[in-house]
From Swiss-Prot:
Function noted in UniProt: Core subunit of the mitochondrial membrane respiratory chain NADH dehydrogenase (Complex I) which catalyzes electron transfer from NADH through the respiratory chain, using ubiquinone as an electron acceptor. Part of the enzyme membrane arm which is embedded in the lipid bilayer and involved in proton translocation.
Disulfide bridge positions per record: none
Annotated keywords: Electron transport, Membrane, Mitochondrion, Mitochondrion inner membrane, NAD, Respiratory chain, Translocase, Transmembrane, Transmembrane helix, Transport, Ubiquinone
Nucleotide-binding listed as a keyword: no
Keyword Aminoacyl-tRNA synthetase: no
Annotated membrane topology: Multi-pass membrane protein
Name of the protein described by the UniProt record: NADH-ubiquinone oxidoreductase chain 4L
Any one Pfam family match given in the protein's UniProt record, by short name: Oxidored_q2
Organism of derivation: Isoodon macrourus (Short-nosed bandicoot)
Locations listed in the record: Mitochondrion inner membrane
GO BP of this protein: ATP synthesis coupled electron transport
Entry-linked InterPro entries: NADH_UbQ_OxRdtase_chain4L/K (IPR001133), NUOK/Mnh_C1-like (IPR039428)
């Protein structure tokens, strides 16, 4: 396995570990999710160019579009939650009431 692929897999794993550990604030969870999506985007782009699968060249762009949509929805939820509850603590939220 190439060192760049190993570094990207390690970056994804660290971002996933960040989601699992730092889940007290919604903002830190959203930042870790963005790190995961960015490492997936770069890894997918490198693998497509390495294996010459140019028919799949739109897949990283679609992933990037979904990542931007996820960030927008996440920030909208963050604003809504922080205005209604006064903080962004995840453990104090019941998402069925929001």
């Amino acid at each position: 396995m190439a060192p760049i692929n190993l570094n990207l897999i390690l970056a994804f794993s660290l971002a996933l570990l960040g989601v699992l550990i730092y889940r007290t604030h919604l903002m830190s969870t959203l930042l870790c999710l963005e790190g995961m999506m960015l490492s997936l985007f770069i890894l997918m782009t490198l693998l497509i160019s390495h294996f010459h699968m140019y028919s799949m060249s739109m897949a990283p762009l679609i992933l990037l579009v979904f990542s931007a949509c996820e960030a927008g929805v996440g920030l909208a939820l963050l604003v809504k939650i922080s205005t209604s509850h006064g903080n962004d603590y995840v453990q104090n939220l019941n998402l069925l009431q929001c």
